[in-house]
């Protein structure tokens, strides 16, 4: 699994593009596109591959959501952690978070080190009715959420096959060999 290391583009809620980067000593730094620093804060561990922008408080002020270890963090653009974060989940995070927006809210998907994709609500609680997605081969990325009519499906591509799941995580299709949509 390739873990992106950034810098991570930050665009929502401001006129000028910025990047959040993790420095060699694990500090987090927000910079302008020309490299000028805005701030830097201490951090103790590597990020797990993505920084997503969310409007957690529904006030049109976006925060940066990211993961490390078994925790999710929410950082505002002034470099302050915002409550009620950090939030712990039950197992180590290999890759994430990946945010899926819907109906003015969002869900958070994480790939855990036990090769399971799990969906969480905005408060980092497992989504009720969700069935973890797991495969025999290593999951290397997040599924695509596809809407067909009124239904939504997760399309997960692995090196060997294409798997289709209901929005709840229930597996309904397995395309392998020459039928795989890789």
What do the PLM-derived regions correspond to, one by one?
Residues 1-3, 36-43, 82-91, 126-135, ...:
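Aromatic (tryptophan-biased) beta-strands that constitute blades/sheets of beta-rich domains
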Residues 2-9, 45-55, 90-100, 136-147, ...:
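Repeated scaffold domains used in trafficking and secretory/extracellular systems
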Residues 19-22, 64-67, 108-111, 154-157:
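Conserved beta-strand element within WD40/beta-propeller blades
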Residues 10-17, 56-63, 100-107, 146-153:
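Acidic, glycine-anchored loop motifs typical of Ca2+
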Residues 60, 84-85, 105, 112-114, ...:
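Trp/Gly-enriched beta-strand/coil motifs that build multi-repeat beta-propeller-like domains
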Residues 2-26:
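Beta-strand-rich domains and repeat architectures in extracellular enzymes and scaffolds
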